A protein has these predicted regions:
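N-terminal pro-sequences and low-complexity stem/linker regions of secreted or lumenal proteins
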Residues: 1-189
Length: 189
């Protein structure tokens, strides 16, 4: 899940630009690329940025707070734990967590950055079930105050998301994202 505007993947990396939060991630040594019971580092892309100084990564890759998450950065990448992203958990567990995280008393959708139209929430899956298949149609949900209820008729993928974030941050496209259309127009972002 990502709360945007922004793209940590291509932004000039600084603590003012991006924050990566990992649900049930390790404390203190967040840059360690190790698996714990409910956390896997592969879901936090910033851990693999080799040009980011270790001290910066430690400051910008943090455990997901149990209460309010701060939405003060241009881009916040939010990674649920394996139970709440349905890798190891059930759809009911993931739904309950997402409902509380987005719509609960301190949920993202009740916070000023969202209600004022400064935040969009993207929810998508990187693979289907346990197969790891990325070719299957996968859920890709965009939530923002300006996004109407609609279904996209064209295929969307990770590059569509990256292109959208780059556009929202006014950054140049990189790699394969340069060859796809973003989502700003169809989703009124």
């Amino acid at each position: 899940m990502a709360a945007v505007p922004g793209s940590a993947a291509t932004a000039p990396y600084s603590t003012k630009d991006a924050l990566v939060t990992v649900h049930d991630g390790p404390d203190g040594t967040h840059t360690a690329v190790i698996d714990t019971r409910l956390y896997v580092p592969r879901h936090a892309p910033a851990l693999y940025y080799t040009r980011v100084p270790r001290a910066t990564c430690r400051a910008d890759v943090v455990p997901l707070p149990a209460t309010r998450i701060k939405l003060k950065r241009k881009f916040t990448w939010i990674t649920p734990n394996l139970q709440h992203d349905m890798h190891d958990g059930t759809p009911a567990q993931a739904s309950a967590w997402l409902h509380a995280f987005l719509g609960g008393p301190h949920g993202v959708l009740h916070r000023a950055p969202y209600t004022r139209g400064h935040t969009a929430v993207f929810i998508w899956f990187d693979s289907s079930s346990q197969t790891g298949d990325v070719e299957t149609p996968l859920p890709f949900i965009v939530i923002s105050p300006s996004t109407p209820e609609r279904v996209a008729v064209r295929p969307l993928n990770h590059f569509s998301a990256l292109r959208t974030w780059e556009s929202m941050l006014h950054l140049p496209c990189v790699g394969a994202a340069c060859f796809v259309k973003g989502l700003r127009i169809p989703f009124h972002l």
